[in-house]
Amino acid sequence: MDAISSLGTNCVLSGVSPFSQENQSKSKLSPFMSLDLKEHPMASADFTNQTLTAFSSSSASPFQAKTSSIGMSRGMRWWEKSTNHNMLEIQSANHLVDSLLNAGDRLVVLDFYSPGCGGCKSLHPKICQLAETNPNVMFLKVNQEELRTMCHGLNVHVLPFFKFYRGAEGKVCSFSCTIATINKFKKALDKHGSERCSLGDAKGLDEKELAALASVGELKMNSLTMHQASNIGYKTEEQYQTMVL
């Protein structure tokens, strides 16, 4: 098994890292911490609505959790938290290719992360906030643990890592970013996310990226990828699969 080692707030990839696990132990209540339930009856707790009701005293008011468009369900793992409208979890190389080609003229941000990467965990809430304040930008999340071969084919060797794509321009920039260098991400978002009219269809992945994914067997031809391959001179799947970098 390979491992992801943490250097500062970046995670350098040499393959897979096991998920970190925390030991859990039951805590004991001290006698002075106990409650006299006869004197202070407890009202029922509505965990479905995330509302905690304290003692049944008329002066006590329940605490209501704040709501937003960012998914923060109880028990949800940190990398599963996302906006409801413009953040999508990529499931395969074909899913990635199709999502980029179907984005039209929208700016698309590929967010490469790993559940075991501390830098990714620290940065993720900021990315969710930026996604919420930039609804016209599409954020595609790529889990390196589940799509390791694809990430290697896309030359992603450090996390967190981002690639920006825009319409007919294709890839416009790529870089590693941490919570300490979040301004780099914000500047790229402002620069490439401004309103513009792109002439031509969305380009998506470039030729080298497509070739790399095909060479490791990650990419299977469908109508969209076949159309993209024909634009660079490959008319059959056999020709595309044998494309040399």
From Swiss-Prot:
Transmembrane stretches, start-end: none
Active site (catalytic residues): C117, C120
Domain Thioredoxin: 93-194
Cellular component, GO, one term: chloroplast
Primary localization: plastid
Family recorded in the similarity comment: Belongs to the thioredoxin family.
Name by which UniProt lists this protein: Thioredoxin-like 1-2, chloroplastic
Organism: Arabidopsis thaliana (Mouse-ear cress)
